[in-house]
From Swiss-Prot:
<dbReference type="InterPro" id="IPR015943">
    <property type="entry name" value="WD40/YVTN_repeat-like_dom_sf"/>
</dbReference>
<feature type="repeat" description="WD 1">
    <location>
        <begin position="16"/>
        <end position="55"/>
    </location>
</feature>
<feature type="repeat" description="WD 2">
    <location>
        <begin position="58"/>
        <end position="99"/>
    </location>
</feature>
<feature type="repeat" description="WD 4">
    <location>
        <begin position="142"/>
        <end position="181"/>
    </location>
</feature>
<dbReference type="GO" id="GO:0005814">
    <property type="term" value="C:centriole"/>
</dbReference>
<feature type="region of interest" description="Disordered">
    <location>
        <begin position="372"/>
        <end position="394"/>
    </location>
</feature>
<comment type="similarity">
    <text>Belongs to the WD repeat POC1 family.</text>
</comment>
<feature type="coiled-coil region">
    <location>
        <begin position="404"/>
        <end position="443"/>
    </location>
</feature>
<feature type="repeat" description="WD 5">
    <location>
        <begin position="183"/>
        <end position="223"/>
    </location>
</feature>
<feature type="modified residue" description="Phosphoserine">
    <location>
        <position position="321"/>
    </location>
</feature>
<dbReference type="GO" id="GO:0036064">
    <property type="term" value="C:ciliary basal body"/>
</dbReference>
<keyword id="KW-0677">Repeat</keyword>
<dbReference type="InterPro" id="IPR036322">
    <property type="entry name" value="WD40_repeat_dom_sf"/>
</dbReference>
<keyword id="KW-0853">WD repeat</keyword>
<keyword id="KW-0966">Cell projection</keyword>
<dbReference type="Pfam" id="PF00400">
    <property type="entry name" value="WD40"/>
</dbReference>
<comment type="subunit">
    <text>Interacts with POC1A. Interacts with FAM161A. Interacts with CEP44; the interaction is direct and recruits POC1B to centriolar microtubules. Forms a microtubule-associated complex with POC5, CETN2 and FAM161A. Interacts with CCDC15.</text>
</comment>
């Protein structure tokens, strides 16, 4: 159990939006924070003292989702105006816009390598876009209601999505097929995501629950009922050991996934909390909600997570359902004193590219937004001295083989650990059997002596 000195604390307070915060993301370098709001604006906050915050103007309706690209030089946003925008996260805030769906777009998510972007919409579809080719690739259709969220797995092989049809679906990005389906008869998931190792998914439920599923064996591992309102968002700590949740009951809760219990309840917002996210290093996390404020928290408790790495690996191999958390009482809530951060804002806007439709052959990126993640020129320069293969499919073969080998090695590692655990259990069983036989022999001898 963490001591009081390791409690998370409120570090900074940001206020600049005029309506509820819907989504936020911390930059990969940990120096910036992007927020989206019902006020139709994006804001980019800099963590340097007395630094300006930049307000990005362009969307015509609620901004529903925002995310930094893996290298931090692009910012993607989704809106109820049915568009997705790609911004350069600087003072000028140049952007490109494309009409992504025929209904409001609910989420955007970059693949870990930055080559693809997934969008989820109320038109019941998930769409995948190539940042390399700068165009639409394919749609995923199987949901029968609004799709609220879609996320890539860390290796990019899978996409997980959740919908108001009360299902969570796992998609194979290679064959574009739904390979698994989790159903719920009570409520639907507002948010879903993979853990950093890609072995599990967690869902934030409208029925006040948080569920963790193992995608390798398609089994529910953990089921938390610790909120008194719908759960709107979750975020995994990079160590895989912790999960932070945001709820309409106005609280944030931190779950210890190794021990399967609630360890912190954080109170700082004065209304429903809609979004929360850990930084890439896990030392910070940010939250936003209906009170229009953004809170930046210092994690603290993650300093000891390295000690539990071996325990974590063993935990992943144990598929028995853990105790249900209905009877687990949380710690005393930790109200934190607000530290108001006054931030000067600068209005910025960008140039809109003409809409060419999702099937158009034209590029959807403004050339000025080209980055190492999506630039064909950059990629060509990196590879021209390594191969002269003429076709794109031929160039992708070595990468596919490498990914397959890495996946095989991961599975072999899991099997090795599984065998080790089985050997330990077998040894314990043999010891217990030996004790039983010895006790039986003693009882038999005692009976013979009495007779």
């Amino acid at each position: 159990m963490a001591s009081a000195t390791e409690d998370p604390v409120l570090e900074r307070y940001f206020k600049g939006h005029k309506a509820a915060i819907t989504s936020l993301d911390l930059s990969p370098n940990g120096k910036q924070l992007a927020t989206a709001s019902w006020d139709t604006f994006l804001m980019l906050w800099n963590f340097k003292p007395h630094a300006r915050a930049y307000r990005y103007v362009g969307h015509k309706d609620v901004v529903t989702s925002v995310q930094f690209s893996p290298h931090g030089n692009l910012l993607a946003s989704a809106s109820r105006d049915r568009t997705v925008r790609l911004w350069i996260p600087d003072k000028r805030g140049k952007f490109s816009e494309f009409k992504a769906h025929t209904a409001p777009v609910r989420s955007v998510d970059f693949s870990a390598d930055g080559q693809f972007l997934a969008t989820a919409s109320e038109d019941k579809s998930i769409k995948v876009w190539s940042m390399y080719r700068q165009r639409f690739l394919y749609s995923l259709y199987r949901h029968t209601h609004w799709v609220r969220c879609a996320k890539f797995s860390p290796d990019g092989r899978l996409i997980v999505s959740c919908s108001e049809d009360k299902t969570i679906k796992i998609w194979d990005t290679t064959n574009k097929q739904c390979v698994n389906n989790f159903s719920d008869s009570v409520g639907f998931a507002n948010f879903v995501d993979f853990n950093p190792s890609g072995t599990c998914i967690a869902s934030a439920g409208s029925d006040q629950t948080v569920k963790v599923w193992d995608v390798r064996v398609n089994k529910l591992l953990q089921h938390y009922q610790v909120h008194s309102g719908g759960v709107n968002c979750i975020s995994f700590h990079p160590s895989d050991n912790y999960l932070v949740t945001a709820s309409s009951d106005g609280t944030l809760k931190i779950l210890d996934l190794l021990e399967g219990r609630l360890i912190y309840t954080l109170q700082g917002h004065t209304g429903p909390v809609f979004t929360v996210s850990f930084s890439k290093g896990g030392e910070l996390f940010a939250s936003g909600g209906a009170d229009t404020q953004v809170l930046l928290w210092r994690t603290n408790f993650d300093e000891l997570h390295c000690k539990g790495l071996n325990k974590r690996n063993l935990k992943r191999l144990h598929f028995d359902s853990p105790p249900h958390l209905l009877d687990i009482y949380p710690r005393t809530p930790h109200p934190h004193e607000e530290k108001v951060e006054t931030v000067e804002t600068t209005e910025t806007s960008g140039r809109t590219l003409p809409d060419k439709g999702e099937e158009a052959c034209g590029y959807f990126l403004n050339p000025s937004l080209m980055s190492p993640e999506c630039s064909p020129t950059t990629t060509k320069k990196k590879t021209e001295d390594m191969s002269d293969l003429p076709s794109e499919s031929q160039r992708s073969i070595p990468l596919a083989v490498t990914d397959a080998l890495e996946h095989i090695m991961e599975q072999l590692n899991v099997l090795t650990q599984t065998v080790s655990i089985l050997e330990q259990r077998l040894t314990l069983t043999e010891d217990k059997l030996k004790d039983c036989l010895e006790n039986q022999q003693k009882l038999f001898s005692a009976v013979q002596q009495k007779s």
